[in-house]
Swiss-Prot record:
Membrane-spanning ranges: none
Entry-linked PANTHER family: UNCHARACTERIZED PROTEIN YQGE, UPF0301 PROTEIN YQGE
SUPFAM superfamilies named among the record's database cross-references: VC0467-like (SSF143456)
Name of protein: UPF0301 protein CBUD_2193
Similarity comment: family membership: Belongs to the UPF0301 (AlgH) family.
């Protein structure tokens, strides 16, 4: 059994045999993991929606025209009517990755006063107590240490392969028929 909280600030990389439409080839940033369950955001599933359309819908004026084309991601199957901003913030302990649902932060981003690096998502992935640990034991997920470049700089289409490569795995070489030793 995986200790609780150990998966916070890690990536989950879907194994090739995971055939659930939502999670096929998904990379998830785990924001929170404790005895009650886990919460994560899929970071490589773009929607047919841009930040410009979201800001227009919210009547927020864009001061930075180039952010209008920033992709909006499907963060997960739960609460897809809710948006999240995934961003980095410096703290006395170092850089932290935070989630926000603040309209004020969206306004700051539109005015070029927000974080330099951010993701905009709709929805999230959630697991009840013990559910994620069982999925990991079933070989549904690789657990990969957090890497800021994967989260903010790697092209969306490359994140699945690049995240697995962080732990020396060529995900394309894995069989969909993985068993237990």
């Amino acid at each position: 059994m995986v200790k609780t909280n150990i998966l916070s600030n890690h990536f989950l990389v879907a194994m090739p045999q995971l055939n659930d439409f939502t999670f096929t080839k998904a990379v998830i940033y785990v924001s929170q993991h404790d005895a009650k369950g886990a919460l994560g955001i899929i970071i490589n599933r773009p929607l047919a929606l841009t930040l410009g359309k979201v800001l227009e819908h919210l009547n927020i004026e864009i001061a930075q025209p180039q952010i209008a084309n920033h992709p909006v991601l499907m963060g997960g199957p739960i609460g897809q009517e809710h948006g999240f901003i995934v961003y980095e913030q410096e703290s006395p302990q170092g850089a932290e990755i935070l989630l926000s649902a603040s309209k004020d932060m969206l306004d700051d981003i539109a005015k070029n006063k927000g974080p330099d690096d951010f993701l905009i998502t709709l929805g999230y992935a959630g697991w009840e107590a013990g559910q994620l640990e069982n999925e990991i034991a079933r070989n549904d997920w690789l657990v990969v240490p957090f890497n800021r470049k994967i989260l903010f700089e790697t092209p969306l289409k490359s994140r699945w392969q690049k995240a697995a490569a962080l732990i020396g795995v060529d995900i394309n070489q894995l069989s969909g028929q993985i068993g237990h030793a």
